[in-house]
């Protein structure tokens, strides 16, 4: 690796670590207010139901009335075309922003626009509803539970400490800054300072206005423990800048020395060792020994000890200038091309520089962790764009096999084996690495199938790591709808159990060959997830009858129904709402070993961990 590329890779790493953490929140505040615009069809009982929380209970009018003594005089009637303030908890959602997620149950004729702009009086948006819900906006099923996200503010000590209670205020066409300030009894400049980028005359959007408590007084901003936000950011950025200059100096010196030493090394010591990672069942982590590729192994927090650095010219030549004939796939972060490099079949993912976070994340994971059931990273390139070079897997991905047109149906035994292979790969990153890795995008499209119909987990661009002993962390929402568990979709809670939930959905896909979210219904098209379909089937008086209707029809009668039932029961255990009740990947591996080979012996350490799950899969 030359000095230029090494510095680029290092700067990308710093960008990933330091500069992707803006706009984070740590904690919320006890209460915020929502400015609810009343139309003639809306009554107080409707508002209390829509805005139900730990502050406002169902049909609890007194709390709402206590904040609106000047406009609400009677429980039975509201004045149309006025506003009332509704209290709600203001929480830190996923470590990303302040808000609260309400739950709305749909009825016939509902759509996202009606929910956002009528029932929730423009306190949320259609875009937020789409982001936090997996339903097709054009086909929302009746009685579906919709996550309604309303943002809020707890104040800003840099502007004023006199105001700690804020109103989430949706602007309307007749609003102006002067009108709002007069009604609130506040200075226009103060309101503008709290909403520096807001245009109050645009007639739409959300602003935050200091609000009054139940006694009609402005509520002061209580100081929180720790350094003030502005000071903390200033100190942190100054420290980072100083550290950056120092590290770049040391880094440049290091590379100059390594470039001199590299010419003395035999060429074979810098090549990727296929023997170590392609077929061995031995596991290798960051503690493993081995020769470093170039100088990138000296990077703090990023290892490329088993990866080769390719030049752009070499990749372009091998792919015929990244021609369409060589293109074999398109993902969320870039296109994938087939190429033969240095005598080996490869798949090259070409990513934009904007995807530096995902590039570094995947590079870090796949150079740290090697396992038979994880796709093997061969090398990378950082010239022009960002490139990752993987081993080429002959048969594409599981999703193509299950959902593709014209593909041969996978035999049931192969489906069980692929499930076991994938579970082993996930078990390894969950339980045999330090720190622990969480994939965050487990789905059939990210499980590759080799020529022997064995599975390998791929696409680690969204992987998160947590230190051993930390059960959960909070993060921004990424992944694929239909595979997200409730605690992640609603609150951004991340733990290994989100991979377990998604794996349960994959088990359902293996049984049905259906997508995770599909359209169903006889007269009205509606969306339904596989989790819901299997819940209904397994709750029937005769669950086997329900399961037979869900099994991939291409299998005809060539499957053991007992085995299907056991896999469905395992999928159900994986997709429980409470993450604490879901099995670990280790228990899942044991269960699938029992399912794939009932006579196969299991080691004692695995067997004792979830005996009830093993018993579940051993008997009907």
Swiss-Prot record:
GO terms for molecular function: ATP binding; kinase activity; protein serine kinase activity; protein serine/threonine kinase activity; transmembrane receptor protein kinase activity. The active site is at residue 441. Disulfide bonds join 25-92, 29-154, 90-152. It is a single-pass membrane protein. Coiled coil: none annotated. One of its GO terms (cellular component) is plasma membrane. ATP binds at residues 328-336, 349. Residues 1-23 form the signal peptide. Glycans are attached at residues 46, 147, 199. It catalyses: L-seryl-[protein] + ATP = O-phospho-L-seryl-[protein] + ADP + H(+); L-threonyl-[protein] + ATP = O-phospho-L-threonyl-[protein] + ADP + H(+). Residues 46-72, 102-148, 167-210 form the LysM domain. Residues 265-292 are annotated as: Disordered. The chain crosses the membrane at residues 232-252. The modification Phosphoserine is found at residues 269, 273. Its EC number is 2.7.11.1. GO terms for biological process: innate immune response; nodulation; protein autophosphorylation; response to symbiotic bacterium. InterPro entries: CERK1/LYK3-like, Kinase-like_dom_sf, LysM2_CERK1_LYK3_4_5, Prot_kinase_dom, Protein_kinase_ATP_BS, Ser-Thr/Tyr_kinase_cat_dom, Ser/Thr_kinase_AS. This is LysM domain receptor-like kinase 3. It comes from Medicago truncatula (Barrel medic).
């Amino acid at each position: 690796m030359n000095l230029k590329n090494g510095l680029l890779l290092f700067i990308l790493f710093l960008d990933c670590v330091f500069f992707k953490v803006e706009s984070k929140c740590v904690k919320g505040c006890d209460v915020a207010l929502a400015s609810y615009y009343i139309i003639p069809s809306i009554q107080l009982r409707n508002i209390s139901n829509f805005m139900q929380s730990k502050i406002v209970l169902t049909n609890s009018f007194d709390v709402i009335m206590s904040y609106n003594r000047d406009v609400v005089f009677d429980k039975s009637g509201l004045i149309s075309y006025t506003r009332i303030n509704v209290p709600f908890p203001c929480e830190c959602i996923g470590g990303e922003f302040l808000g609260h997620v309400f739950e709305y149950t749909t009825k016939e004729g509902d759509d996202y626009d009606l929910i956002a702009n009528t029932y929730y009086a423009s306190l949320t948006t259609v875009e937020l509803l789409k982001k936090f819900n997996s339903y097709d906006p054009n086909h929302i099923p009746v009685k579906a539970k919709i996550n309604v996200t309303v943002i809020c503010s707890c104040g800003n000590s840099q502007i004023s400490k006199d105001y700690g209670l804020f109103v989430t205020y949706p602007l309307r066409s007749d609003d102006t800054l002067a009108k709002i300030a007069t009604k609130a009894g506040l200075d226009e400049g103060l309101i503008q300072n709290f909403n520096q980028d807001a245009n109050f005359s645009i007639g739409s959007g959300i602003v935050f206005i200091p609000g009054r408590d139940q006694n009609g007084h402005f509520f002061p901003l209580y100081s929180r423990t720790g350094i003030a936000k502005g000071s903390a950011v200033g100190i942190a950025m100054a420290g980072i800048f100083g550290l950056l200059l120092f590290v770049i100096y040391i880094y440049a010196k290091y590379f100059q020395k390594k470039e001199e030493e590299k010419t003395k090394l035999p060429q074979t010591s810098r090549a990727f060792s296929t023997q170590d990672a392609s077929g061995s069942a031995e596991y290798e982590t960051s503690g493993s020994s081995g020769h470093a590729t170039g100088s990138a192994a000296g990077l703090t927090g990023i290892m490329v000890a088993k990866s080769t650095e390719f030049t752009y010219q070499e990749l372009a030549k091998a792919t015929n200038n990244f021609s369409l004939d060589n293109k074999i796939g398109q993902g969320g972060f870039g296109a994938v091309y087939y190429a033969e490099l240095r005598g080996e079949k490869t798949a090259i993912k070409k990513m934009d520089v904007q995807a530096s976070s995902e590039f570094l994340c995947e590079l870090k994971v796949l150079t740290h962790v090697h396992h038979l059931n994880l796709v093997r990273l061969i090398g990378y390139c950082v010239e022009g764009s960002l490139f990752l070079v993987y081993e080429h897997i002959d048969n594409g991905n599981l999703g193509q096999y299950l959902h593709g047109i014209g593909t041969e149906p996978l035999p049931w035994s192969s489906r069980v084996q692929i499930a076991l292979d994938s579970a082993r790969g996930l078990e390894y990153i969950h339980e045999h690495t330090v720190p622990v890795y969480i994939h965050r995008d487990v789905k059939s499209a990210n499980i590759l199938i080799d020529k022997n119909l064995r599975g390998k987990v791929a696409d680690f661009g969204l992987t998160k790591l947590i230190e051993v002993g930390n059960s959960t962390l909070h993060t921004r929402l990424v992944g694929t709808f239909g595979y997200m568990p409730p605690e992640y979709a609603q609150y951004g809670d991340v733990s290994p159990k989100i991979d377990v939930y998604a794996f349960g959905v994959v088990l359902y896909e293996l049984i049905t060959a259906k997508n995770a979210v599909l359209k169903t219904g006889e007269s009205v098209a509606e969306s339904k997830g596989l989790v819901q379909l299997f819940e209904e089937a397994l709750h029937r008086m005769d669950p086997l009858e329900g399961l037979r209707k869900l099994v991939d029809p291409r299998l005809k009668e060539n499957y053991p129904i007992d085995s299907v039932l056991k896999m469905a029961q395992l999928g159900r255990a994986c997709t429980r709402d409470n993450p604490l009740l879901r099995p670990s990947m280790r228990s899942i591996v044991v269960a699938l070993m029992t399912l794939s080979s009932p006579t196969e012996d299991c080691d004692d350490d695995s067997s004792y961990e979830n005996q009830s799950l093993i018993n579940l899969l051993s008997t009907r």
